[in-house]
Amino acid sequence: MYLNYNSNDTFVSTGGKNIELNKPTICFVHGAGQNHFSFTQQIRYFANRGYNVLSPDFPGHGFSKGIPNSSIEEDAKWLLGVLEKIGIKKFVLGGHSQGCLTALELSQLKPEVLKGIIFIAGASKIPVNDFLIGKASEDPYKAYDLMVTWGH
């Protein structure tokens, strides 16, 4: 589904199901340079077993428009805002890679909304290729394209 958040079209995968606020909710958060496709199988599985499943594409990722957020804190605040706009009050949050850091940050900002956290392949430090760091300084969009290319 698409919704307008912060004046941008924001895509949130729901597994093709309508959101029913009385159902339990799981939200999956992708890592840097990724999108909701990281969770295709999980989204389908839980959506077809009575859960609301949400997996938003962060700004500038996947089908969402806008400039990518510049920090983990911005990602967490953005995610909270999107879920609040949809009407989700409590949820389980699953993060992959950088999404784990977003989930951890969200747990510090607003712990009362979480029923649980799932960390998938997270790390406290992620080594980054020196060439990519240089490209990010010169041309952030080229660096993003390289991450997507190298990731597939």
How would you label these PLM feature ranges?
Residues L3-S13, T40-N48, N52-G94:
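Active-site loop/oxyanion-hole signature of alpha/beta-hydrolase fold enzymes
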Residues T10-N22:
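Short beta-strand-to-loop junctions in surface cap/lid or active-site-entrance loops
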Residues N22-G31:
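Short beta-strand element of the alpha/beta-hydrolase
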Residues G31-Q34, S97:
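Active-site glycine-rich loops that stabilize anionic/oxyanionic intermediates
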Residues G33, F58-G62, S124:
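Alpha/beta-hydrolase active-site loop signature
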Residues K89-P127:
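Conserved hydrolase catalytic core segment
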Residues I118-H152:
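Helix-rich cap/lid subdomain of alpha/beta-hydrolase
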